[in-house]
Regions:
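Active-site metal-binding core of divalent-cation-utilizing nuclease and nuclease-like domains
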Residues: 39-72
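Charged, often low-complexity linker/regulatory segments
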Residues: 1-47
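Short linear sequence elements within intrinsically disordered, low-complexity coil regions
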Residues: 11, 33-34, 41, 52-54, ...
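Low-complexity, compositionally biased segments
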Residues: 24, 31-34, 46, 71, ...
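Acidic-residue sensor for enzyme active/binding pockets
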Residues: 21, 50, 78
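N-terminal, well-ordered alpha-helical segments
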Residues: 26, 30-34, 51, 67, ...
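Short, basic/polar, glycine-containing "phosphate-handling" surface segments that engage DNA
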Residues: 1-12, 59-63, 73-74, 79-94, ...
């Protein structure tokens, strides 16, 4: 898939844009993998959709949850439907970080915007924002491809 095709498919007003959060998340992520020429999730122990976890709350209660996409040593990724709060998605990922082996990048997306939040031990977090319409730019593609291939470059 080419970046232009991806933008057309996921732009506001398209049938794909109208997909619900869960159906849209996996389809969008697979398309991103194809645009960037990286493998799709397929190993429940290192790179998968719906990575299960159990988090412990401040009162000691335990809650089960799932990260939409997880790649060991690279990222945890949480999707929201277009227009929904990416801040809420980030809060969710921050709570999930420890049970997910503290990935160095926390990524949130509403399929129109991808926000990459660095989560490196001992350093302040940085936020990098990429918009759907910018996906054809080579420098944006290079930065996003680095999520899979060189997370330390963030």
């Amino acid at each position: 898939m080419q970046a232009d095709d991806f933008i057309r498919k996921w732009s506001a007003g398209s049938p794909a844009h109208a997909l619900g959060e869960r159906a849209g998340a996996q389809a969008d992520f697979i398309d991103l993998c194809r645009v960037f020429g990286v493998p799709e999730p397929g190993d429940p122990d290192s790179y998968c959709f719906e990575r299960g976890l159990t988090k412990t709350g401040s009162t000691g209660g335990r809650t089960d949850g799932f990260a939409d996409v997880w790649k060991r040593g690279c990222f945890a990724w949480e999707y929201k439907a277009p227009g929904r709060s990416l801040e809420a998605a980030l809060k969710q990922l921050v709570m999930y970080a420890l049970p997910l082996e503290s990935p160095p990048l926390l990524v949130v997306s509403d399929r129109q915007t991808v926000e990459v939040h660095t989560h490196f031990t001992g350093t302040p977090s940085e936020r990098h924002v990429f918009r759907l319409e910018d996906m054809t730019r080579p420098e944006v593609q290079q930065r996003l491809r680095a999520l899979w291939l060189a997370p330390e470059s963030y």
